[in-house]
Amino acid sequence: MLKQRVLSAIVLIAAVLCALFLFTPFYFALALGAVAILGIWEWTQFARLKQPLIRFFVTTFLGVFIFLWLYTEGNYLDAGRVFEQHLQLLLINAVSWWGLALLLVISYPKSAKFWSKNPLLQLLFAFSTLIPFVAGVLRLRLEHYTHDPYHGLFLLLYVFILVWAADSGAYFSGRAFGKRKLAPKVSPGKSWEGVIGGLITALVLAFIFIHFSNNTLVGDRNITGFIILSVATVAISVLGDLTESMFKRESGVKDSSQLIPGHGGVLDRIDSLTAAVPFFSYFYFFVL
């Protein structure tokens, strides 16, 4: 099992790095679209769409919409421009959705009676999770793209590394000190001590990146605000994890799929990032 997980992780990392460094913005966007479509396929089971044919139809319909959306933006993406007319609205939608998700998680299982048997509402949740995630990733990746193609890459990797490192910090802190359960009805393994460990990890990492980047990450933004945003982004990433756990628990599945050997499905790998990336993008570009 461990060998399988390690091999899968190596392949995943190689694929991500290849897409980040070698793909043009348009093809990078198409790769992201493929990830989103796989996420929708997995999400259809949360919406209690049990028949494979119905799941395939719904996924195909939404997948065509996503690819047409990205295709029509192809020239703008290659010019370093990302959904300029709709980006802020998409990210505001994401921030609002995660505010609602917090209420759903806190009140679970009582909240389930409002959404668990409503496929359309569940698919709306999927849209509010995955589409702003794609837009946020692209906006970060293409920041100052025409002047420096790697500036946005550094910014995007910062968010990814921040979330992944904080997740590791939370894991080890929870193992060592975890006593008080964070959300026992949703994810019994998570503790408040683990969350605090993750936030401390994020704080330390933010200082390190700011110091060694010579303020490239921050730009003309307030450093204190950037650090607060980094820590808040990690806090929101925990909500992304908890929200997917809630949907899986309600639908009676352990993993979103078995697509990635030893790691579960696509949603299992990006659940934290689907909350973190739009949240960070909105406040980084429109608030700070």
From Swiss-Prot:
InterPro entries: PC_trans
GO cellular component: a single term: plasma membrane
Transmembrane helix among keywords: yes
Disulfide-linked positions: none
Pfam families assigned to the protein according to its UniProt record, in alphabetical order: CTP_transf_1
Compartments reported by the entry: Cell inner membrane
Mutagenesis / variant outcome for changing T59A: In strain: 33
A GO molecular-function descriptor: phosphatidate cytidylyltransferase activity
Catalytic reactions of this protein: a 1,2-diacyl-sn-glycero-3-phosphate + CTP + H(+) = a CDP-1,2-diacyl-sn-glycerol + diphosphate
Membership in a protein family: Belongs to the CDS family.
The name this protein goes by in its record: Phosphatidate cytidylyltransferase
